[in-house]
């Protein structure tokens, strides 16, 4: 099972990624984790990445793809792998294809933006303990106050409505085009690569966590 998980921030990809990893016995490939591990290990690619990072520059797509290829050689990828958060852009997707990274499924978790804004902007947390609440779905017993300590709850900057909207705008511009890219490849194939086209699946990300999990498993049969 070689899989790319797509969906907007707040669509619940992380939660579903955990279910998929467990069911199929595959690792989740995180480019951030890979970069940190390569830099720490001092591998040639890691040293190259460190030069970019120390200069405050973005690591090039070419270097990230080489790190991905190196990571996929590890024994835990023998049964497949799951990409969540990569590729983010069409050039990255194209580079993956040209590098011969095989993908069986692209699974999109589809949630309307107004629902995502409601989900994320309603989160509240207790800073000291990390306990989280939601003003609509999981409210504290007393509004704005932690159940255990009676201390005030905060809204993280990441969860403020204007921040959520900005993140969704970036997603709309950079990552959403991947949906059309993979959909087109799945439907029409691509003679420029020997890779088999992936199957494209879209599921609704509305409902309970278990309902969405069942939809995901059904889509990946």
UniProtKB/Swiss-Prot annotation:
Gene Ontology BP annotations:
AMP salvage
PROSITE patterns assigned: ADENYLATE_KINASE (PS00113)
| Localization annotation | Cytoplasm
According to the UniProt record, where is the region NMP?
A: 30-59
What Enzyme Commission number(s) apply to this enzyme? 2.7.4.3
Domain note: Consists of three domains, a large central CORE domain and two small peripheral domains, NMPbind and LID, which undergo movements during catalysis. The LID domain closes over the site of phosphoryl transfer upon ATP binding. Assembling and dissambling the active center during each catalytic cycle provides an effective means to prevent ATP hydrolysis.
- The molecule here is called Adenylate kinase
């Amino acid at each position: 099972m070689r899989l790319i998980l797509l969906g907007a921030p707040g669509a619940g990809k992380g939660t579903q990624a955990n279910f998929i990893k467990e069911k199929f016995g595959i690792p989740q490939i995180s480019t951030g984790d890979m970069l940190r591990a390569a830099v720490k290990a001092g591998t040639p690619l890691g040293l190259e990445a460190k030069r970019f990072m120390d200069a405050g520059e973005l690591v090039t797509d070419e270097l990230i793809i080489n790190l991905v290829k190196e990571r996929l050689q590890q024994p835990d990828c023998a049964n497949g792998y799951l990409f969540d958060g990569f590729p983010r852009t069409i050039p990255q997707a194209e580079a993956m294809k040209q590098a011969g990274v095989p993908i069986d499924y692209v699974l999109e978790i589809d949630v309307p933006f107004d629902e995502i804004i409601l989900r994320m902007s309603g989160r509240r947390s207790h800073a000291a303990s990390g306990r989280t609440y939601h003003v609509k779905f999981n409210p504290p017993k007393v509004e704005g106050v932690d159940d255990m300590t009676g201390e005030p709850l905060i809204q993280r900057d990441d969860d403020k409505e204007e921040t959520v909207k900005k993140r969704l705008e970036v997603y709309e511009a950079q990552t959403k085009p991947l949906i059309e890219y993979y959909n087109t490849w799945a439907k029409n194939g691509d003679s420029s690569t020997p890779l088999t086209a992936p199957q494209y699946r879209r599921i609704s990300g509305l409902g309970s966590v278990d309902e969405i999990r069942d939809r995901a498993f059904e889509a990946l049969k």
